[in-house]
Amino acid sequence: NNNYEAALGIVDSMEENDRNSITLLIWMLTRDCNALNALKMGKQNLKEFGIWDNQIDLYQKMGNRLTKHRITEVTNVLDDADKKVKGVLPGNSWLTAREAVKLLSV
C-alpha cells in the first residue's frame, strides 16, 4: 500500500537523521489514536489534539477504515515502544513503532 510505504519512509528518515525523534513519533501516533477514538465517540472538534478543521476529513477516513479494536491495539503497541525507549522493556523501539505504523496503514 502506498500510504504504508510513504509512512515507512518517513519513519526511516526520522531514525536515520535523529534517533532521538522516536519519542516525538510515539507521541504523534498516540495523539492520532486518541483523536481517532474521540471521533469514534462522536466528537467533531479535535482542536484539543492539535488537529484543525481542515484535517478532520483525513481523520474521519482513517476512523472509518480502522476499528476501535485496531486503534486500541495500536495504542498498546505504542505503549510498548515507549517502554522500550525508557528501558522498561527490552527491544528496539523503532521496530515497535514501525509495527504501529503498519497496523494504522492496513
Task: Explain the meaning of each model-derived region.
Residues 57-59, 75-86:
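Short helix/strand-capping connector loops at secondary-structure junctions
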